[in-house]
Amino acid sequence: MPKMKTDRGVAKRFKKTANGFKRKQAHLRHILTKKSTKRKRHLRAKCLVSKADVPAIARQLPYA
């Protein structure tokens, strides 16, 4: 059986940790002037992928 391929886009966006998959939060690319400093600061923090999405991410990262 051939090797499974890693989805490179997913590999760049998610990192496997002991607690699940770490990801960056959205809404911090543009139109930042109307967002408060507190909101932007909190959006810089990494968060975990939700439980429902973990199987899909794991399938695309077979060697993670």
UniProtKB/Swiss-Prot annotation:
One of its GO terms (molecular function) is structural constituent of ribosome. Keywords: Ribonucleoprotein, Ribosomal protein. One of its GO terms (biological process) is translation. SUPFAM superfamilies: L35p-like (SSF143034). It comes from the Bacteria. Gene3D superfamilies: 4.10.410.60. PROSITE patterns: RIBOSOMAL_L35. GO terms for cellular component: cytosolic large ribosomal subunit. InterPro entries: Ribosomal_bL35, Ribosomal_bL35-like, Ribosomal_bL35_CS, Ribosomal_bL35_sf. PANTHER family: 54S RIBOSOMAL PROTEIN BL35M, LARGE RIBOSOMAL SUBUNIT PROTEIN BL35M. Belongs to the bacterial ribosomal protein bL35 family. This is Large ribosomal subunit protein bL35. It comes from Shewanella putrefaciens (strain CN-32 / ATCC BAA-453). The gene is rpmI.
